């Protein structure tokens, strides 16, 4: 029952899917009729995100094209729903630009402009840091670029929060705190760190709290 399977994938938003063997999922997808898959655009979005997590980028791109085709073939889709689908597609594609904040930000803004509700493929209780103990470590790219990268984080994260229910909240403040610490501005670092702690308090995003804790220990 591929219809039922795709509905479960949509409702689960990829949480249980992540515990499955990627090869099993890929084999099942190969067996699923394309016409059936096209009827479940939200499930395609969840699968795209899962393919990114599994580093199955060619399959991710194949699913993206299938999504765009499915949307194009269904002119009866309301404009708001169409915007949410295309916006979430942009959001998922932004992960391919990691760790170029400028490129990611362009796609986050595009998604934010199109979407009227939060993404279904990203849960705000899920990890944001991909296991990294440092936001600065994730996004600092080269000498002389730090000020621009901090400004980009300040600009892009509100757009990202809007479409993910605050996933990764506090990231820009943590990066500011880490940057100030590395520059020897310890008072500024402590102020930014406390601001980050206040922003993430009680939201269940332990990965962000751990980044704060690692900096506090230093």
What is each stretch, according to the model?
Residues 1-53, 59, 63:
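Extended alpha-helical scaffolding segments used for macromolecular assembly and cargo binding
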Residues 35-214:
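Internal alpha-solenoid helical repeat scaffolds
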């Amino acid at each position: 029952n591929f219809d039922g399977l795709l509905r479960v994938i949509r409702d689960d938003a990829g949480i249980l899917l992540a515990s499955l063997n990627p090869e099993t999922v890929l084999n099942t997808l190969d067996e699923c009729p394309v016409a059936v898959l096209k009827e479940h655009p939200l499930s395609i979005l969840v699968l795209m995100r899962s393919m990114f997590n599994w580093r199955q980028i060619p399959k991710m791109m194949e699913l993206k094209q299938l999504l765009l085709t499915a949307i194009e073939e269904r002119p009866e889709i309301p404009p708001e729903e169409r915007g949410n689908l295309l916006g979430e597609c942009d959001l998922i594609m932004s992960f391919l630009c990691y760790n170029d904040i400028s490129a990611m930000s362009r796609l986050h803004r595009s998604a934010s402009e199109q979407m009227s509700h939060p993404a279904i493929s990203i849960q705000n209780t899920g990890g944001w840091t991909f296991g990294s103990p440092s936001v600065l470590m994730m996004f600092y790219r080269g000498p002389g670029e730090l000020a621009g990268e901090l400004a980009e984080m300040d600009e892009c994260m509100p757009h990202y929060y809007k479409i993910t229910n605050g996933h990764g909240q506090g990231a820009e403040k943590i990066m500011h705190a880490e940057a100030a610490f590395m520059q020897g501005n310890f008072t500024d670092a402590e102020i930014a760190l406390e601001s980050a702690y206040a922003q993430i308090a009680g939201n269940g995003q332990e990965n962000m709290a751990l980044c704060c804790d690692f900096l506090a220990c230093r």
